[in-house]
Structure formats: structure tokens, C-alpha cells
């Protein structure tokens, strides 16, 4: 059928539809037709001319492009098929209206503009894969970050996708909120995925840390999209409940791996040993399941991304407080035991190395001459050396303080390596 025949048929259909459904023409329109003594045939012809003119103007407005952008886009098929629809429903904790910011990143990538995606978290994000008993059957032995990145490169093969992996083992959102500026936001990411649900505690202090981390990302100058990923141990331990409260407050997409593996184990689909070789870190199977969940979410947004409006500028109030919005890490090369140093802050923390060689010990921390806490650099019998971070001092105002780290009695001569001074200042 030619275009003009389609237009003519449309005109006739519209006229008959109005007449049959009792949707009468307005009095003004009837007078217009009567004055010109238009028969039904002439009226259809008139509508045909009008529709042709409208179409012409539409084509001119579209710079001559007659091909309409499809409402539903084709999506890439997930690399695996471990997750059922029922399990996916358990994983997707966000609301439909929360996807506009992620859709905007997809639209940018579809236009072949370079995009940057970043993931910040602990060892799971860093790429640790434990040995599960079913891993021999897993075809894609990749970390979830690699699988997450693969969706973007497969979906937009002609777009440059920059990937920032800011995962550091044995760290939580307290260190995360202090390092996010340098490790993530300095790259001006379009999308940031946050994963700290295994390493964070469920305490109110931990919730404040996580809230400030997420809020700091959302308030960045380039307004990146944010996704929250809730990993979990096979024994069910994680901070999902606390973290989800932050996600609901800010209306963010939330994907729960924890919900899915608990359902899988309850249904007898997989055992704990298949999902993790050490209870904490996902096996290759666990990472594959996580990657599939992320692909399902991204596909669900992408196939209808044209329907999402432009994301609103983030302006929601803080869920807890804004204690760490100005958090950062100061270098500590010159910090020595028993030698005071000066720092201006409202809160103070220390990042220090814990070692398994037996040379670590207990050290007291003093602020303005008063004892405020201690750090323990000894990790004898542990799984390995690592960088610990903890808050030592907090106040309601920003001011200059004199800080000193002292050997405690019985630990003289023990090693104490300070890696960073974690500070924040209140407005």
C-alpha cells in the first residue's frame, strides 16, 4: 500500500470512528463542512489533504528522517541462564520510576559518546572468586564487574566504555566515603555501582558511612547514575536491610544477590558450597549469577529506555546526616609513633596496616592530650596482611587538633605503619 493510500484510509477510518462512536464533529466543523456542501467523500478527501500536510511538516521537523526510533530496543542475551523469572523478581528491589538516570547513560552510549562506569566495593568487587564445588561447570569464570562491563561493550560495540574498578579487599564504606573522590569521582563517571553489603556492619554508624558515600556520589558535579548491589554471604549475613533504607530514600535501583541465593538454597537449586568456597566470597557460579542479575536489570531498562524522561537533578534530603560529605584521606608518610602532628577536622580516622608476622601491637591515640582510643596492628593467625581503617575521634565542629600515636605498655618496639589520615570537615 502506498503512503498516500495509507493516509486516505486513515482519514476515512477517523471519520467513520467519530461518527460510529457518537463523537460528533464540533459545531464549528459541521458549519465548515455544510457551508462548502461537502459530501462524506469530499470530507474524507479534505482530511486526507490535512493529514498529508501534517505528515509533511513532521518530516521537515525531523530533518527528513522517515525512520522512527523503535520504542523497544533489541537487547543482548545474558551469557548464562541460572536465574528464573521468580528469582529475578526477588532480586529487583527498585521501582520502575528509579531507572531514568541509568537510561540516560544508555542513551548517551547509543549516541556513540564515550561513557565511564565505575564500581566501588570490597574484595568481591575487586574480583575475588572463591572455589565453589560446581565451578567446573561454569562457562564464564569472570568477576561480576567483568560481566557487568561486558553488557555495556556488547550492547554498544561502537562506543568507548571506560571501566573503573575501585574495589579494595577488606574495606567497608567508611574507607569508601573517604576515598571515593580520588578513586571514583575524579574520573567523572556516568554510572557508579556501589557494593559494600558484605563488608559493612548493620550498625547505625555503618549506615551513616554508607549514606554519606552514596550521597556524595549523587551530589557530584556531573550527577552520575547510581546502582546499589547487595551481595551476601551464604549464611545470610549482610547489611542489605540497612543499605536498602538508603536506596529507598533516594529512589535508586537496587539488585539483591543475597535474596536470590537464599531462595536458590531454600529451593534446593544450589548448595552453599556451590555458591561460595568460603561462605563470604562468591564462587565462579556466584559471580555468574550476579552478572546475570545485572544483565537482566540493564536489559529491562534498555529495551524501553526511550520511555524514560530526563533524570531530575538530585535534591533529596539526607537519610542520616552529612557528616562525611567533605571526607578525604591525607598522606601519612611523616606520621611517626610518639611524634605529635596537627590536623584540622571534625572527625578523625586512621588507615593502618595489620600484619600476620607477629610484629604488630597495640597503640593508643591521643587528641589534644586526651586518650580517645587505640589501634591494633597485630593480625597473627589471620588470613593475611591488610589495611584497616577506623574512626578514632569525632566532634560537632571543625577545628585544629594535635594528634599523637603512642606505644602502649607491653608493646614497646612493635611495628605501626600508618597508611593514611582520614578526616572530614563540617560546613
Q: PLM features: residue spans?
A:
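Bacterial lipoprotein signal-peptidase II cleavage site
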Residues: 64-70
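Conserved catalytic region of serine esterases and O-acyltransferases that act on ester linkages
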Residues: 72-86, 90, 288-427
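Bacterial N-terminal signal peptides that target proteins for export
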Residues: 40-50
Amino acid at each position: 500500500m502506498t503512503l498516500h493510500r495509507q493516509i486516505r484510509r486513515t482519514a476515512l477510518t477517523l471519520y467513520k470512528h467519530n461518527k460510529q462512536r457518537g463523537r460528533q464533529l464540533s459545531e464549528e466543523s459541521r458549519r465548515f463542512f455544510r457551508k462548502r456542501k461537502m459530501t462524506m467523500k469530499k470530507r474524507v478527501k479534505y482530511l486526507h489533504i490535512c493529514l498529508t500536510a501534517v505528515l509533511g511538516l513532521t518530516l521537515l521537523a525531523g530533518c527528513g528522517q522517515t525512520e522512527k526510533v523503535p520504542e523497544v530496543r533489541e537487547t543482548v542475551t545474558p551469557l548464562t541462564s541460572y536465574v528464573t523469572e521468580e528469582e529475578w523478581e526477588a532480586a529487583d528491589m527498585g521501582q520502575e520510576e528509579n531507572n531514568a538516570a541509568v537510561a540516560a547513560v544508555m542513551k548517551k552510549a547509543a549516541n556513540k559518546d564515550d561513557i565511564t562506569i565505575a564500581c566501588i566495593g570490597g574484595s568481591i568487587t575487586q574480583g575475588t572468586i572463591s572455589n565453589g564445588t560446581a565451578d567446573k561447570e561454569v562457562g564464564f569464570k569472570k568477576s561480576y564487574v567483568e560481566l557487568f562491563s561486558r553488557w555495556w561493550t556488547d550492547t554498544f560495540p561502537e562506543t568507548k566504555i571506560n571501566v573503573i574498578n575501585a574495589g579494595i579487599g577488606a574495606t567497608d564504606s567508611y574507607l569508601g566515603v573517604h576515598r571515593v573522590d580520588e578513586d571514583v569521582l575524579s574520573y567523572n563517571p556516568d554510572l557508579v555501582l556501589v557494593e559494600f553489603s558484605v563488608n559493612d556492619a548493620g550498625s547505625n554508624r555503618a549506615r551513616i558511612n554508607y549514606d554519606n558515600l552514596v550521597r556524595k556520589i549523587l551530589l557530584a558535579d556531573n550527577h552520575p547514575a547510581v546502582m546499589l548491589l547487595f551481595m551476601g554471604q551464604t549464611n545470610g549475613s549482610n547489611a542489605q536491610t540497612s543499605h536498602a533504607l538508603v536506596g529507598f530514600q533516594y529512589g535508586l535501583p537496587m539488585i539483591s544477590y543475597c535474596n536470590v541465593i537464599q531462595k536458590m538454597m531454600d529451593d534446593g537449586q544450589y548448595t552453599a558450597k556451590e555458591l561460595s568456597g568460603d561462605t563470604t566470597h562468591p564462587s565462579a557460579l556466584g559471580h555468574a549469577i550476579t552478572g546475570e542479575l545485572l544483565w537482566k536489570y540493564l536489559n529491562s531498562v534498555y529495551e524501553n529506555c526511550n520511555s524514560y524522561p530526563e533524570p531530575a537533578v538530585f535534591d533529596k534530603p539526607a537519610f542520616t546526616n552529612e557528616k562525611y560529605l567533605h571526607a578525604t584521606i591525607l598522606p601519612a608518610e611523616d606520621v611517626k609513633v610518639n611524634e605529635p602532628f596537627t590536623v584540622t577536622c571534625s572527625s578523625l580516622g586512621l588507615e593502618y596496616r595489620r600484619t600476620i608476622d607477629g610484629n604488630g601491637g597495640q597503640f593508643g591515640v591521643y587528641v589534644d592530650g586526651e586518650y580517645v582510643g587505640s589501634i591494633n596492628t597485630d593480625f597473627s593467625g589471620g588470613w593475611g596482611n591488610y589495611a584497616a581503617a577506623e574512626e578514632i575521634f569525632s566532634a560537632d565542629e571543625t577545628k585544629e587538633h594535635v594528634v599523637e600515636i603512642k606505644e602502649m605498655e607491653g608493646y614497646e618496639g612493635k611495628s605501626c605503619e600508618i597508611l593514611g589520615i582520614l578526616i572530614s570537615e563540617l560546613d
